[in-house]
Amino acid sequence: MVNSCCGSVCSDQGCDQGLCQETCCRPSCCQTTCCCPSCVVSSCCRPSCSQTTCCQTTCCRPSCCHPVCCQTTCRPSCGVSSCCRPLCCQTTCHPSCGMSSCCRPLCCQTTCRPSCGVSSCCRPLCCQTTCCRATCCRPSCCGSSC
């Protein structure tokens, strides 16, 4: 049985049961809904972040509280859920990009080519009708041959 919250300090008793508790049992976790004992970030004990695996401090919004989003960094302003993946949690992201692979750092530019078969061709200079190869991404080289 987990003790209920007592003001600003909570009891740690019962926190090793491996299940989410109705009442908080860890410090800084006195919220309506508690995190599971596997939560290691106190700020992740917010109700919206009470998932099996907790998010990091910078990634505690409801849509980002999945295991795949719990990375060191996350993009809160990213408009697509696929940008919550580890490879997409970068400084910049392109929400309107049609391909999940375009959420990689090199692809998170103003323009992107969703139909581009080469991930490195998602850079601005390579967003042409026909994509270049990875080693041939100059504007004048985005043709059928490089």
Curated annotation (Swiss-Prot):
InterPro entries: KAP (IPR002494). Expressed in the hair follicles. GO terms for cellular component: cytosol; keratin filament. Sequence repeats lie at residues 5-9, 24-28, 29-33, 34-38, 44-48, 54-58, 59-63, 64-68, 69-73, 83-87, 88-92, 102-106, 107-111, 121-125, 126-130, 131-135, 136-140, 141-145. Residues 5-145 are annotated as: 18 X 5 AA repeats of C-C-[GRQC]-[SPT]-[VSTL]. The keyword Repeat applies. Keywords: Keratin, Repeat. The keyword Transferase does not apply. PANTHER family: KERATIN ASSOCIATED PROTEIN, KERATIN-ASSOCIATED PROTEIN 4-1. Belongs to the KRTAP type 4 family. Interacts with hair keratins. In the hair cortex, hair keratin intermediate filaments are embedded in an interfilamentous matrix, consisting of hair keratin-associated proteins (KRTAP), which are essential for the formation of a rigid and resistant hair shaft through their extensive disulfide bond cross-linking with abundant cysteine residues of hair keratins. The matrix proteins include the high-sulfur and high-glycine-tyrosine keratins. This is Keratin-associated protein 4-1. The lineage of its organism: Eukaryota, Metazoa, Chordata, Craniata, Vertebrata. The gene is KRTAP4-1.
